[in-house]
Curated annotation (Swiss-Prot):
Record flagged with keyword Glycoprotein: no
Matching NCBIfam families: hpr-ser (TIGR00679)
Superkingdom of origin: Bacteria
Further information: Both phosphorylation and phosphorolysis are carried out by the same active site and suggest a common mechanism for both reactions.
Protein name: HPr kinase/phosphorylase
GO biological process terms held by the UniProt record: regulation of carbohydrate metabolic process
Taxon lineage: Bacteria, Bacillati, Bacillota, Bacilli, Bacillales
Alphabetized CDD domains for the sequence: HprK_C (cd01918)
Organism of this sequence: Bacillus cereus (strain AH820)
Role of this protein: Catalyzes the ATP- as well as the pyrophosphate-dependent phosphorylation of a specific serine residue in HPr, a phosphocarrier protein of the phosphoenolpyruvate-dependent sugar phosphotransferase system (PTS). HprK/P also catalyzes the pyrophosphate-producing, inorganic phosphate-dependent dephosphorylation (phosphorolysis) of seryl-phosphorylated HPr (P-Ser-HPr).
InterPro entries for this protein: HPr(Ser)_kin/Pase, Hpr_kin/Pase_C, Hpr_kin/Pase_Hpr_N, P-loop_NTPase, Ser_kin/Pase_Hpr-like_N_sf
Length: 309
């Protein structure tokens, strides 16, 4: 099922429907837009018919210089069965040839009061957000000191309980149990909650609680960029865990690699505090302050100094 149809653009941007009402359910499969200037001159070899077409002042001014036969020919070529719609910007008058071609092909012809550049920018942002690659991950997403932390781990390891403690400490819940993730840009993953379980948290033995009702609107947010993954696992005596923080694990989601920290879970460990510190330490590293690296350098300097003596 298509994520975006022409009718969605009409509703989102309050576009005026001039003709082609029967085609408003046409799918839009790309966030790329087209301003068919070269096509107005008659070159249709590489015409991207599957894109939303924008006709601005430049295109229509040139169109006025064409002969009557050329106008009809160009507009018929523009209005294909594949084209989602044509949008005339700046509330300009719609040429009769375009109106006729739209009616014959059933292609939606729309009009906007916005400038071409402004509308193009808004359309691109909207379509990129809607058409971005998506996936779902089992875990909890929390905003901790401005860092989007995705907490993962096996079922029953304590993800939701840890998230509840983090919310009590003033941080904000984004999603629990199922995190919908979309890649809005290169190296940019944004997580949100499915509508059905938005603002809800499931605690074993307690049931489902509404975080916004209990803790207020400041305890939740609708979406957050994910920059850090913390994986909780039951403590394994045979496994060697990182004690210095020099080695950095990575986890790939869609086409983006994220920093991953594995935290062993055992009785007596305050996971909420550890995750808080992990988020703060992650921010420090991004600012160029790496405590583990500094310790390693001091240690090497001390060893070299000892060898010289």
């Amino acid at each position: 099922m298509p994520k975006v149809r022409t009718k969605d653009l009409i509703e989102q941007f309050h576009l005026e429907l001039i003709s082609g009402e029967e085609g408003i359910h046409r799918p839009i499969d790309t966030s790329d837009l087209s301003r068919p200037g070269i096509e107005m001159a008659g070159f249709f070899t590489y015409y991207p018919a599957d894109r939303v077409q924008l006709l601005g002042k430049t295109e229509l001014t040139f169109f006025d210089t064409l002969t009557s036969d050329q106008k009809q020919e160009r507009m018929k070529a523009l209005c294909t069965e594949e084209t989602p719609c044509i949008i005339v910007t700046r509330n300009q008058d719609v040429p009769d040839e375009l109106l006729q071609a739209s009616r014959e092909s059933g292609m939606p012809l729309l009009r906007s009061s916005q400038t071409t550049t402004r509308l193009s920018s808004r359309l691109t942002n909207y379509l990129e957000g809607k058409l971005a690659p998506t996936t779902a991950v089992h875990g909890v997403l929390v905003d901790i000191y401005g860092v989007g932390v995705l907490i993962t781990g096996q079922s029953g390891v304590g993800k939701s309980e840890t998230a509840l403690e983090l919310v009590k400490r003033g941080h904000r819940l984004v999603a629990d149990d199922s995190v919908e993730i979309r890649q809005e840009d290169e190296d940019m993953l944004v997580g949100s909650s499915p509508d059905l379980i938005e603002h809800l948290l499931e605690i074993r033995g307690l049931g489902i609680i509404n975080v916004m009702t209990l803790f207020g609107a400041g305890a939740v947010r609708n979406y957050k960029r994910i920059t850090l993954v913390i994986n909780l696992e039951i403590w394994d005596q045979k496994k060697n865990y990182d004690r210095l923080g020099l080695d950095e694990e990575k986890m790939k989601i869609i086409d983006t690699e994220l920093t991953k920290i594995t935290l062993p879970v055992r009785p007596g460990r305050n996971l909420a505090v550890i995750i808080e510190v992990a988020a703060m330490n992650f921010r420090l590293k991004r600012m160029g302050v790496n405590a583990a690296q500094q310790f390693s350098e001091r240690l090497m300097s001390a060893i070299e100094l000892g060898n010289q003596e």
